[in-house]
Amino acid sequence: DPDGTSRRRFVERVRRSRTTIGALLMDQKVVAGIGNIYRAELLFRARLDPFVPGRDLTAGMCEEMWEDLVALMTYGARTGRIVTTQPEHRAIEARIVERSRGTRQNGDEDPDVVPREESFYVYHRQTLPCRLCGTTVRSGEIAARTVFWCPRCQSARSRRADWTRQHPAAPWALAEAPAR
């Protein structure tokens, strides 16, 4: 999207809708290509409650979410894996156990591959503690799909009025990744 048309269309469609942002991200008319993993992780990284109506978001929130989505999907396309966590947010103990078993996300044997259990902040982590605050991750349903979120990190109180909070994985997601 070199001319920014898709970004502008995304921002416009989200901001004029009463539908929840969690449902809008799964609507192919709003944005194509986002599956359940990217939806859950994108909303967590943006500290957005999945049940907030799109019209309650600012243009800045939508634009930053778009930028993060592009970075995550670019990384995923380059590496062939979906990884949304920063290295410092992964549990060392889980990496040791996972490596001893020898299984990796997508069956990859590369020792530098992030184990699936360490790849996500909230996706499929319901009943487990949030990697950032320790609150139990919850799950519910939006748009006939299960959605995962941290009730503390993704509450209205977790966002600031000017929304200047940096995404937890922004510097890492934009780092050069090895090609597959």
List each model region and its residues.
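An acidic intrinsically disordered interaction segment
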Residues: 5-9
